[in-house]
Design a protein with these regions (language model features):
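Short, Lys/Arg-enriched N-terminal segment that forms or immediately precedes the first helix
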Residues: 4-21
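Short helix-coil-helix linker/hinge
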Residues: 23-27
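Long, charge-rich, low-complexity alpha-helical segments
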Residues: 28-68
Length: 68
């Protein structure tokens, strides 16, 4: 029998100005999405913005793809 994985919270937080950022960083959701749409892989994005873990990059991209 396959176990159902726990739901994971998105690593996104809105700042005082309403800008959505990857939690614990200054990197915005828009930045991740723009670089992804320009053709960067999740690995390249995580390397470019080293404060964002690869898992968080995948979570943000998944959120973006699911909601567009």
């Amino acid at each position: 029998m396959m176990a159902i994985p726990e739901a994971q919270l998105l690593p996104l937080k809105a700042d005082a100005h309403g800008v959505i950022r990857v939690a614990g960083t200054r990197v915005t959701l828009d930045t991740i999405v723009e670089v992804f749409n320009d053709g960067a892989s999740a690995e390249e994005i995580s390397h470019r913005y080293s404060v964002v873990s690869l898992a968080d990059v995948y979570a943000v991209i998944g959120y973006y793809l699911h909601n567009t």
